[in-house]
Amino acid sequence: MAAKDVIFGGEARARMVEGVNILANAVKVTLGPKGRNVVLDRSFGAPTVTKDGVSVAKEIELKDKLQNMGAQMVKEVASKTSDIAGDGTTTATVLAQAIVHEGMKYVTAGMNPMDLKRGIDKAVHALIVELKKASKATTTSKEIAQVGSISANSDEAIGKIIADAMDKVGKEGVITVEDGKSLDSELDVVEGMQFDRGYLSPYFINNPEKQAALLDNPFVLLYDKKISNIRDLLPTLEQVAKSGRPLLIISEDVEGEALATLVVNTIRGILKVVAVKAPGFGDRRKAMLEDIAILTGGKVIAEEVGMSLEKVTLADLGSAKRIEVGKENTIIIDGAGAAADIEARVKQVRVQIEEATSDYDREKLQERVAKLAGGVAVIKVGAATEVEMKEKKARVEDALHATRAAVEEGIVAGGGVALLRAKQAVGTLKGANADQDAGIKLVMKAIEAPLREIVYNAGGEASVVVNAVMAGKGNYGFNAANDTYGDMIEMGILDPTKVTRTALQNAASVASLMLTTECMVSESPKDDSAAGMGGMGGGDMGGMGGMGGMGM
């Protein structure tokens, strides 16, 4: 095991704070409407330009081990805030730096760090209660658009697209972000349920312009095994042919003579049929087949429940108003399932979401809910260059998270004002002793930091603005975009309550851990200078020897 350095007390904390400051100073230049960009070097490809706090934080690794530990702890603040609320990463970093900066003064002055921590916790708890009281529910699509545009660094077009997407697919719908093909961002809404499997044979195509198979008012057969023998399918095909309606077959696979027979029947016009593979794998495939069954009002034909293909009746088949099958996707529009059954299924999947342990599972389950409940909206981000596209896409994703957070917990005045109002509402808070009082006091001072940084980035005088805002009431604050004062919510400067709350909680949590640090252990740097040169051997390399007469 490598040798370790063990550093105690003030020296350890001082080095850690240096790391915190390096990271926080790099992140906080991006805060506010007049925040600047940070350019990140890439080992290959063009450098990335970003105004997203967490992207900057993730890039930073410091050479000094102790400084790096400080930086990594603050990085945790940014990434945790990003995970939970999806935005507010820069605010969280600025708050953490401010709490550490204020707190270190008290620790150095000899106050008890544990009591300081208790004071900090008490103050944060009181502030969050006030934030929740001040929170206002987000209902109109105008408010949603405002939240989106603030989070996308005052880009109104992005805010509007997100609000439109939420209108179309509802609060529960899935909204995904993809690279667009044009210069402008556009919104594409898929009504109904879409899954990523296309036709098994191009001979099923009946609409050459769209390169798709369109089925109107079709039956849907759901089977969880492979179909290779056409004899199993014949009874179903005969019944469907009599009814004169088309048929979509969703099964693990259709191969060999079964597929050939279906293709021949389709080409001859005897029966309009399309076969696709079932979406997903393993247990997820079964669950998704069940979802489709509930959506279309059919049953999954599975041997486990004693059903077989030969005995299928029309009552076992699902149906839908319309189905579009492309090369890679199938869309089921307006399935015939009962609304109550779909509702019950959505509830069931929601319970699974709450119990899910991995992010991947949770994401997949949320997709299933959206496919059952609303629909899917795709925001295609347009930009002139690859670099701009990446930067814009990151902002759209941020804005999307922020709007979701706003719908969930409501909004408060933006621009750092909500924290100052919460501070005023808390008034005088007392701890159990003088050291706890100091902890409360330092939080109350530190929560001015986001507003100070916004003003500083806009080239203003922070103290003047803070005093002016503190003299006002309610949503009165400073709009750094055009250097005016007024009602923040009317000016459209809002933050989701969840974002502000999460930023404060995470910042205080990590900052108080740093204040209560007394010892740091890191690997000793290896001394390379002596070892590097070793073993060249025989110092003199010997002459080159004469070139010999070249006989010109």
UniProtKB/Swiss-Prot annotation:
Residues where ATP binds: 30-33, 51, 87-91, 415, 479-481, 495
Major subcellular site: cytoplasm
Any one biological process term the GO annotation gives: protein refolding
PROSITE patterns: CHAPERONINS_CPN60
Translocase keyword on record: no
Chemical reaction(s) catalysed: ATP + H2O + a folded polypeptide = ADP + phosphate + an unfolded polypeptide
Subcellular location: Cytoplasm
Molecular function GO terms recorded: ATP binding; ATP-dependent protein folding chaperone; isomerase activity; unfolded protein binding
Pfam families cross-referenced by the UniProt entry: Cpn60_TCP1
GO cellular component terms, semicolon-separated: cytoplasm
Keyword terms, alphabetized: ATP-binding, Chaperone, Cytoplasm, Isomerase, Nucleotide-binding
Homology family: Belongs to the chaperonin (HSP60) family.
NCBIfam families on file: GroEL (TIGR02348), PRK00013.1 (NF000592), PRK12849.1 (NF009487), PRK12850.1 (NF009488), PRK12851.1 (NF009489)
PANTHER family with a match to the protein in the record: 60 KDA HEAT SHOCK PROTEIN, MITOCHONDRIAL
Record note on quaternary structure: Forms a cylinder of 14 subunits composed of two heptameric rings stacked back-to-back. Interacts with the co-chaperonin GroES.
Functional summary from the UniProt entry: Together with its co-chaperonin GroES, plays an essential role in assisting protein folding. The GroEL-GroES system forms a nano-cage that allows encapsulation of the non-native substrate proteins and provides a physical environment optimized to promote and accelerate protein folding.
Descriptive protein name: Chaperonin GroEL 1
Lineage: Bacteria, Pseudomonadati, Pseudomonadota, Betaproteobacteria, Burkholderiales
